Amino acid sequence: MTRRLLDASTYAVLATVNGDGSPQSSVVWVRRDGDELLMSTIRGRRKTANMARDPRVSLCLYDPADPFQYVEVRGTVDMVEEGGNELIDELSRAYMSKPWKHRPAEVRLVVRLTPSKVVERVSVQSPSYVGRDD
């Protein structure tokens, strides 16, 4: 289920930790790169500052056709500028079927999430749930 959701250009919610310890969530585009996940952000955004200070994140994806199925990926991130514009173009084509409209003042970053834990859930309410006969 995890690879299927990631390969289907499913919107995801990225949770980071604010400086005061409170959670901060952002809807993001994501793609798989082997066992790691790539996202794009802009230098100066709150999530960017949060990840620079504390690289621990959680990413949640759910199946729009069956929201009772979801995947949570926990791990740490690193961010680099190299390839930032190329990644947002690739993600924009996957999610919007067109290239990204770049703004010269924006510095794009590649966010690479290295998973430490992956949690998959299928609720008993899901049409995909297969119960046990016991």
Where on the chain are the PLM-derived regions?
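Extreme N-terminal tail/first-helix region
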Residues: M1-Y11, P127-D134
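A generic secondary-structure signal marking the coil-to-beta-strand transition
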Residues: T2, T10, D35, Q69, ...
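Residue-level signal for well-ordered alpha-helical positions
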Residues: N50, D54, V124-Q125
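Charged, gly/pro-rich active-site loop segments
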Residues: F68-D134
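A generic structural signal for nonpolar/aromatic side chains embedded in well-ordered alpha-helices
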Residues: L5-L6, M51, L91, L113
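Short beta-strand segments
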Residues: S9-R43, M51, V57-L61, Y70-E72
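Short secondary-structure boundary segments
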Residues: I42, D63-P64, P115-S116
